[in-house]
Regions:
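Conserved GNAT acetyl-CoA-binding A-motif
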Residues: 107-119
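Conserved beta-strand-loop-alpha-helix junction that forms the acyl-donor binding cleft
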Residues: 91, 117-127
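Glycine-rich phosphate/pyrophosphate-binding loop shared by adenosine-nucleotide-utilizing enzymes
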Residues: 1, 60-64, 152
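Acetyl-CoA-dependent GNAT
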Residues: 31-89, 100-101, 160-162
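A short beta-loop-alpha structural element at the N-terminal edge
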Residues: 2-16
Length: 175
């Protein structure tokens, strides 16, 4: 398995991984599958500030993970939300864990200290993976998203890195 930075050429593979999450699950609250050009736009926007990684096995992209802004205020500059998606046929093979490890390491190198995951529940596999990685549940929002003719809850999980906070200037220099 190779974990590498995303390329715009990966957009079609990423869309193929994401499509069943949109059309078959409430794991994402997105209801329409984005186009390849939309994924290219999202990749470009994410890479302007955050890491975006893919897992490749035998030349095929089987998963991806990226970070995004938790909230657009300066006081949150040490906090980021992580997202991960693994192809159906590749789940349970360690791809998600490898992606998360690489993403967390990159984020720490850039000065981020708080990692958040927003998880639609029920999703025992995602919650177990996050707990194994040191995340704890910090919030539960009942009936907050409506998809497939029913309401769905979300939970927020957080992992805290106990490093000293750098000045904003030091953090910006690492990014």
């Amino acid at each position: 398995m190779i974990i590498r930075p995303v390329q715009l050429a990966d957009a079609a593979a990423i869309r193929a991984i994401y499509q069943p999450y949109v059309t078959e699950t409430a794991i994402t609250f997105e209801v329409d599958v984005p186009t390849v050009p939309e994924f290219e736009r999202r990749i470009t926007k994410t890479l302007a500030q955050y890491p975006y990684l893919v897992a490749e096995v035998g030349g095929k992209v089987l998963g991806y993970a990226y970070a995004s802004s938790y909230y657009a205020r300066a006081a949150y500059d040490w906090t980021t939300e992580l997202s991960i998606y693994v192809a159906k046929e590749a789940r349970g093979q360690g791809i998600g864990s490898a992606l998360y490890t690489a993403l967390e390491e990159e984020l720490q190198a850039r000065g981020y200290l708080r990692f958040l995951a927003c998880i639609a529940v029920p999703n025992e596999a995602s919650i177990a993976m996050h707990e194994k990685r040191g995340y704890v549940q910090v919030a539960h929002f009942p009936r907050i998203g409506y998809k497939f003719d029913q309401w769905h809850d979300i939970v927020w999980m957080q992992k805290t890195i106990d490093w000293p906070v750098n000045t904003l200037k030091e953090v910006e220099e690492k990014r």
